[in-house]
Regions:
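N-terminal, active-site-proximal structural segment of metallo-dependent hydrolase catalytic domains
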Residues: 2, 16-99, 155, 159, ...
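Sec-dependent signal peptide recognition
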Residues: 2-9
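Beta-strand-turn-beta hairpins that frame and shape the catalytic cleft
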Residues: 18-22, 106-109, 123-145, 267
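Structural recognition of the beta-strand scaffold that forms the well-ordered cores
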Residues: 21-24, 50-56, 84-85, 100-101, ...
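Solvent-exposed loop/turn segments at secondary-structure junctions
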Residues: 27-32, 57-61, 88-93, 106-109, ...
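Metal-dependent phosphoester-hydrolase catalytic domains
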Residues: 60, 166-172, 181-267
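Extracytoplasmic, non-cytosolic globular domains
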Residues: 129, 133-200
Length: 267
């Protein structure tokens, strides 16, 4: 009996451990300005995840190349990675960005082409980037997003997210990215009423200019929203990558946001 119980626990533990891990990171101005050393640091930080969603890829020359450099560096870590990059968003010229996804091909399969939101691309300045993946026999679609800055009132565009689950009723949506807005804001209430929950509550994710009294994080901007009826959170966390640097100024050469992640199972 004890052996049976032990085997069951081992199998359950192995099953949970093998579930997909998704990380989201706003990597500030990911483009030609990032050195090979900085790209290598990013790869070392991200290599243990299965899907990477990136915001703030430079729209012009150097952005797509930086993602390719990151994929190349990840491929040196022992697993095979692939990637896809969005077209520039339809925002004003100086606000245009790209999004990117990278994924371990042994863990998940990309289904079809990734695409930028079409219906609300005028209402949302940097319209979100969708990509459908399959893990075992179940599919889910990650919706990668970078909102306008806080002083420009990101809630004025996040409010359109309440229409997306119905618009894509055949998809299991996971919203990730930099919302420049805390999950407690009432703009998220319609999504919550539809069964969506945030992975993080009260977790600050942007870097201060300087640490004060040991506190280095400024605002609760980045998050992940999942449909609680179809997805179960197994584990989650943030990566305090800045602790590897002597100062926040040095750390900010990588990014002014920290990566956020969660591991999940599909019901």
């Amino acid at each position: 009996m004890k052996i049976t119980v032990c085997l069951f626990l081992l199998l359950t533990s192995a099953l949970l451990f093998s579930q997909p891990k998704l990380v989201s990171w706003n990597i500030e101005n990911l483009g030609k300005s990032k050195s090979n050393t900085e790209i290598a640091f990013m790869a070392a930080t991200l290599k243990d995840f299965d899907i990477i969603a990136i915001q703030e890829v430079v729209a012009g020359y150097g952005g797509a190349q930086a993602v390719a450099r990151l994929a190349e560096e990840l491929n040196r870590k022992g697993s095979k990675w692939n990637y896809t990059i969005s077209d520039p968003t339809s925002s004003s010229a100086y606000k245009k960005e790209r999004y990117a996804y990278l994924w371990k091909t042994i863990k998940v399969t990309k289904i079809g082409k990734a695409w930028l939101e079409k219906k609300y691309h005028l209402e949302i300045e940097r319209e979100p980037y969708y990509c459908t993946f399959q893990y075992e026999n179940k599919k889910f679609t990650v919706v990668n997003f970078h909102a306008i800055t806080k002083n420009r009132q990101p809630e004025t565009e996040i409010k359109y997210f309440k229409f997306l689950p119905d618009q894509h009723s055949d998809l299991n949506l996971i919203f990730v990215g930099d919302f420049n807005c805390p999950q407690s804001h009432t703009v998220f209430n319609p999504l919550k009423k539809l069964g969506y929950q945030s992975v993080f509550i009260g977790q600050k994710t942007s870097l201060k200019q300087q640490c004060k009294n040991g506190k280095c994080l400024a605002s609760e901007f980045d998050n992940i929203f999942y449909q609680s009826t179809t997805i179960k959170v197994i584990n989650s966390g943030v990566m305090h990558f800045y602790k590897n640097f002597n100062s926040l100024k040095e750390a900010r050469s990588i990014s002014d946001h920290i990566p956020i992640w969660f591991q999940f199972s599909l019901n």
